[in-house]
Amino acid sequence: MPPPVLIPDARTLDGLATEVPGAVRSLAAAFWPGALTLIVKAQPTLTWDLGETRGTVALRVPDHPLALALLRRTGPLAVSSANRTGRPAATTAADAAEQLGEAIAVVLDGGPTPGNAPSTIVDATGDRLRVIRLGAIPLAELRAVADVLGPDEPREPAHDEPAAGSAEATGGADAPGDGR
């Protein structure tokens, strides 16, 4: 999964993403600013080194006045959670400074986080929108806005790929090219 990129508002979506489905725009309108991260196809002109993202970008508009003010001045920022691997996310600036120590140069203290539920992450890069992490926004609320698969629901095959378990997918006797 690509690292999250915080943006100041939904207008930034088209500058960083391509092929944005209407359902993604509906989710953004309903839940941004807020705890919704949307994974979309990245603009080919996006040349940031975000690691191996497979041509995607994860976007979120935070619901915090200090973060939004910073983003309006700086533009989009790739971020990470303020914690060490395996430790709970920091909920105060002091927690973040204690966990990250000399690995960070600056800590902005905007007060304690309003809750410790992570953002809900929706992958919009496939044929159907799919929740890949449930978080602060429940699946039912997402589904009130858009057709979204839950994290445990099976993915439907694309129109040009065989269904899982079919003879064609498993190389069974009825599969094309089996030489019989």
Regions found by a protein language model. Name each.
Residues 1-180:
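Active-site-adjacent structural elements in enzyme catalytic cores
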